[in-house]
Curated annotation (Swiss-Prot):
It comes from the Eukaryota. It comes from Cyriopagopus hainanus (Chinese bird spider). One of its GO terms (cellular component) is extracellular region. InterPro entries: Toxin_22. This is U11-theraphotoxin-Hhn1a. Expressed by the venom gland. GO terms for molecular function: sodium channel inhibitor activity; toxin activity. Residues 1-21 form the signal peptide. Residues 22-74 form a propeptide. Disulfide bonds join 75-90, 82-95, 89-110.
Length: 113
């Protein structure tokens, strides 16, 4: 009975020690693979970042050109009600409260300066 226990104990110790060695080797292999993967991901990330920066530069360039050439957009003409806090009267007009006619509307209108 003692020989069976000793044999079992010996086999158990060998299995555990060999299993640990395999586990350490597997760990080292996984670390190598993840390091290689990280370097690839870093490269891909940098490449994507460069492309996005180029695209952003092109878009900003187009926006600046558009703003230089653009006309005034959607404005309110003379005699049209406007908002006191957000006047969108066309150039040369001011958002004012009416003096005589239209006082009963309690609204502001676009008038010439």
């Amino acid at each position: 009975m003692n020989t069976v226990r000793v044999t079992f104990l010996l086999v158990f110790v060998l299995a555990v020690s060999l299993g640990q060695a395999d586990k350490d080797e597997n760990r080292m292999e996984m670390q190598k693979k993840t390091e290689q993967g990280k370097s690839y991901l870093d490269f891909a990330e940098n490449l994507l970042l460069q492309k996005l920066e180029e695209l952003e530069a092109k878009l900003l360039e187009e926006d600046s050109e558009e703003s230089r050439n653009s006309r005034q957009k959607r404005c309110i003409g003379e005699g049209v009600p406007c908002d006191e806090n957000d006047p969108r009267c066309c150039s040369g007009l001011v958002c004012l409260k009416p003096t005589l006619h239209g006082i009963w509307y309690k609204s502001y209108y676009c008038y010439k300066k």
